[in-house]
Each structure stands twice: as C-alpha cells, then as structure tokens.
C-alpha cells in the first residue's frame, strides 16, 4: 500500500510542475554590407635585405700560415698529407670548400708534402659515412680519415670568431700518434 501511495504522490507532484514553454528562436538580424571608405595602404617601410656574404681572399689568408708550416722543425719531406676540410665555427656562413681548395693549392705550390687527391678523400669520406660539411669536425675524425687513407700527416683547420673578426687556426698532426707537430693562427682577410 505504501508503494501505491508513494507512486501516486510522485505522479501528482510531477504533474504539478510547471513545464516551460519552448522558446522561440529570435530571427537573425540582417547583415548590412559596409563599403570600405579607404583602401588599406601597404606599409611604407621596406623589408631590410639580408646581409651579403663578403668575399674572403683565402689565398692571402692561408699563404703566411703555409709558409710557417713548411718551415716547421722536424717535418719530413715528401710525406703523404691529408688536408682536412676547413671547419666553420663562426656565427655566419663561410665558403669552407673555397678555403680548403686555397689551402691545398698553397701547400702543393711549396712542394714539401705529397697531397692525397681530393677524389680519394671524398671516396674515403663516403666509405666512412662522413659528410663533406660535417659540423662536428673533430680531430679524431680527421685522424681516422687520415689512417684510412694511409697518410703520415693531417692538417686540421678551424675558422672561428664572428662576422667582424674571424681567425683561422691550423694544426699539423702526426697520424700515428695524434701529436700536434705544428700549430699556427692568423686573421681571415
């Protein structure tokens, strides 16, 4: 009996609740097109041009260092030399291949070392999985490459600094021991 009474009271209570009438949606307001009174003007400032890469005279930069190198004490003539790619540790872009070529030409003109041909170096780099523009150019990689090519010496070069003042550092290393036999530095012109 209680159940019936409870159900009856619930029905009466729920029937007595006012139901909300459904709301009528408001009609959309018409869109009035507005004609622009002024045409937008483009900004008057020009976009600045990126800085142009300055030409570096690599021949005059590396020649004094090569002259110091060939006069270094304790070097044997006609030994096989690997000229490793010049590394760029500056905050800008450099033509490292042009620098490496200028370095190779300056060394070959002195007739002190026998240079490993560039195509042999490129083939060895590919065999060892080294990139030509390897940004992580380490001395150990240069010595490993020189050992692979059976070179007696390796010339490791780094250009560092910023766009205003750059320096080049060269190190001649004995491949067998990794000993630095000669080190020189100069300004990049």
Swiss-Prot record:
Q: What membrane topology term does the record carry?
A: Lipid-anchor
Concerning Gene3D superfamilies, the annotation shows: ABC-type transport auxiliary lipoprotein component
* One cellular component (GO) term of this entry: periplasmic side of cell outer membrane
Q: Where is the lipid attached (N-palmitoyl cysteine)?
A: 17
Keyword check for Transmembrane: no
Provide the GO biological process annotations.
Answer: peptidoglycan biosynthetic process; regulation of cell shape
- GO molecular function terms listed in the Swiss-Prot or TrEMBL record: enzyme regulator activity
> Which residue stretches does the UniProt record annotate as biased composition, category Pro residues?
19-45
Q: Which Pfam families match?
A: LpoB (PF13036)
Q: Describe the function of this protein.
A: Regulator of peptidoglycan synthesis that is essential for the function of penicillin-binding protein 1B (PBP1b).
Query: What HAMAP family does this protein's entry cite?
Result: LpoB
Its quaternary structure?
A: Interacts with PBP1b.
What name is this protein filed under? Penicillin-binding protein activator LpoB
